[in-house]
Amino acid sequence: MDKKAIFDSVSNMEEQIGELYQQLGDLKTNLGEMLEENNRLNLENEHLRRRLSLTDEATPEPKAEIEAEHGVMAPNRKEAMQQMIELGEGYDNLVQLYKEGFHVCNVHFGSPRGNDEDCLFCLSLLNKK
């Protein structure tokens, strides 16, 4: 091989590496978007499951309707209301998400944290408790 052919071959390889690097960047961006969407959908599913279980528990039976008319709350409904009032659960969920490597701040909520780096916005939110 002469020097020109070698130079052309190296230039061609450099172009291919550049294209592969661009494709890798695109894949990384798509993966980040999919992780954000997956996290958002998981949160939504969990919220909907809780809401469904609360509505199933709170569905009044004939006896419960009579109790509700007289101002006495049915035991299941009372428990459901207590669960809704419980504030620590939401905080615990945010802490768990942060530990799993996702932002919980209003600036970058749901997006993955790069290399598990700490986010000052997230930390200030979690330390407000």
Curated annotation (Swiss-Prot):
Transmembrane segments: none annotated. Its cofactor is Zn(2+). GO terms for cellular component: nucleoid. Coiled coil: none annotated. GO terms for biological process: DNA replication. The keyword Ribosomal protein does not apply. InterPro entries: YabA. Zn(2+) binds at H103, C105, C119, C122. It is found in: Cytoplasm, Nucleoid. Keywords: Cytoplasm, DNA replication, DNA replication inhibitor, Metal-binding, Zinc. Binds 1 zinc ion per subunit. Its main location: cytoplasm. The keyword Zinc applies. HAMAP family: YabA. Involved in control of chromosome replication initiation. Inhibits the cooperative binding of DnaA to the oriC region, thus negatively regulating initiation of chromosome replication. Inhibits the ability of DnaA-ATP to form a helix on DNA; does not disassemble preformed DnaA-DNA helices. Decreases the residence time of DnaA on the chromosome at its binding sites (oriC, replication forks and promoter-binding sites). Tethers DnaA to the replication machinery via the DNA polymerase beta sliding clamp subunit (dnaN). Homotetramer. Interacts with both DnaA and DnaN, acting as a bridge between these two proteins. Belongs to the YabA family. This is Replication initiation control protein YabA. It comes from Listeria monocytogenes serotype 4b (strain CLIP80459).
